[in-house]
């Protein structure tokens, strides 16, 4: 049974500057939560690993899309997938920390994040969707871990400052 609800979070974490109150919209299915929306002030946001005792396991499609004031995001180890266009048009995003349990980055997951200079794709990611980092014009280098087997079309297209991409031999499918 799916249900939707809003959760008001106070994100005054020691490791990150206080960002005030951030509102996350979630859905629940089989005892796990998917983040489906964000309506907070931006700045630095640390996505919680659990809310009210339920694990947060997925960032849904367009959940943080067009959050132009978002500058830093920490994705916990509880997250297993990042949905399509989850962070698209987060034009002020300068840092993203992706948890080690993420297995897939959806199509357009971080496209148009013009201020993002670097991204560490953790070991465990199997699939990088098409246009995942499309037009991330500040991105300078990317190392693909050996766990990745598939890279979608245009995953790094129009990353105009990208000077180095390291792709391991285990990648069996690259769509151009």
Regions found by a protein language model. Give the residues of each.
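Acidic, Ser/Thr
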Residues: 37-38, 50, 63-64
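Structural signature of tandem-repeat unit edges
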Residues: 28-30, 41-58, 68-81, 91-104, ...
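Consensus positions within tandem repeat domains that build extended binding/scaffold surfaces
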Residues: 61-63, 83-88, 106-112, 129-134, ...
């Amino acid at each position: 049974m799916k249900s939707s609800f809003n959760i008001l979070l106070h994100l005054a974490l020691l490791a990150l500057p206080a960002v005030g109150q951030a509102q996350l919209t979630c859905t629940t299915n089989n005892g796990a939560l998917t983040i489906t929306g964000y309506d907070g002030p931006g700045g630095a946001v640390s996505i919680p690993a659990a809310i009210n005792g339920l694990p947060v396991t997925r960032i849904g499609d367009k959940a943080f899309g067009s959050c132009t004031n978002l500058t830093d995001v920490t994705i916990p180890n509880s997250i297993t997938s990042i949905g399509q266009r989850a962070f698209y048009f987060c034009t002020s995003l300068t840092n993203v920390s992706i948890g080690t349990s993420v297995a897939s980055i959806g199509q357009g997951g971080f496209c148009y994040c013009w201020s993002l200079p670097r991204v560490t794709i953790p070991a465990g990611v199997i699939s990088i969707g098409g246009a995942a980092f499309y037009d991330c014009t500040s991105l300078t280098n990317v190392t693909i871990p050996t766990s990745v087997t598939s890279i979608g079309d245009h995953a790094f297209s129009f990353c105009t400052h990208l000077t180095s991409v390291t792709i391991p031999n285990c990648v069996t499918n690259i769509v151009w």
